[in-house]
A protein has these predicted regions:
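Conserved structural core of kinase catalytic domains
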Residues: 108-147
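Catalytic-loop of the protein kinase fold
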Residues: 160-175
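ATP-binding glycine-rich loop module of kinase domains
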Residues: 58-59, 63-98
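A conserved alpha-helical element in kinase catalytic cores
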Residues: 84-116, 146, 191
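Conserved alphaE helix
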Residues: 143-157
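C-lobe/activation-segment region of protein kinase-like
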Residues: 176-244
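Basic helix-extension-helix modules of the SAP/HeH family
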Residues: 1-44
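Juxta-kinase regulatory segment immediately upstream of eukaryotic protein kinase catalytic domains
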Residues: 38-59
Length: 244
């Protein structure tokens, strides 16, 4: 940042910057400029110290709606997945995503959150092995019944934890060993009375996510075998309406 340009500003302009940064308002411009410059330098040092904690090794998967996920390594050699966000991602939204993923991870259905930063906009978590879609390819394009049971188990636990995931994209399911996890809580919401009233069910993961996933699998022309167990959790009305 070019701090010299700040000196070209008027007292009133400098005062407005100081107010926006919650800094002390001083009687002369020079003192306020020192405070502003010091605050910016502290911020830059903070960002550098956080970014230096992790070395980006490679991109994981495709670029998402909100940003990119990387494989990162710490100085001690530990490897994690870092989900980065665009600058527009608000701190409150990022914190909400962290909170809901932590709630899910405590139940063993989502990657554990290792670290996060609302300034540099990232969440660091345990890295997974492979996507469900990659596993499906090796299985002849189908989801095994045992894997469908894991998905339903995930949905039930999320409902119990009052966390509505909200995105049934098959890309949001990953394995660590043989254990299936759900990832990307960017669209997740807390299950509240207002949400229950809006969606018409107190178990939206079972009743909405299951339908969403089955429809995605049908759209991908997957064998009915891939959702034979899943569709047992759909209502008769849902099955008739969507020809499942």
């Amino acid at each position: 940042m070019n701090y010299n340009k700040l000196e070209e500003l008027s007292y009133q302009e400098v005062k407005e910057i100081a107010e926006n940064m919650s800094l002390r308002i001083r009687r002369n411009k020079e003192d306020m400029l020192k405070d502003i410059t010091s605050a910016f330098k502290d911020y830059e040092r903070y960002k550098k110290s956080k970014s230096d904690k992790y070395t980006r090794v490679k991109q994981i998967g495709e670029k998402g709606k909100e940003g990119i996920t990387y494989l990162v390594k710490t100085k001690s050699g530990s490897e994690y997945a870092m989900k980065t966000f665009r600058a527009q991602k608000s701190s409150s939204k990022l914190l909400q995503e962290v909170e809901l993923q932590k709630a899910a991870s405590e139940l063993g259905v989502a990657p554990r959150v290792i670290d996060y930063d609302t300034v540099s906009k990232y969440i660091v978590m345990d890295k997974m092995d492979k996507h469900l879609l990659d596993v499906m390819k090796k299985q002849g394009g189908v989801i095994l019944k045992t894997q469908q049971k894991q998905i339903i188990s995930i949905y039930k636990k999320l409902d119990e934890a009052n966390v509505f995931h909200g995105d049934a994209n098959p890309l949001n399911y990953m394995f660590l060993g043989k254990q299936l996890y759900i990832i990307d809580f960017g669209m997740s919401k807390k299950i509240t009375n207002s949400l229950i009233k809006k969606v018409g069910t107190s178990t939206p993961n079972i009743h909405i996510m299951t339908l969403g996933l089955v429809l995605k699998l049908k759209e991908m022309n997957c064998s009915p075998e891939s959702y034979e167990y899943l569709k047992k959790f759909l209502s008769e009305e849902q099955r008739k309406q969507f020809c499942i």
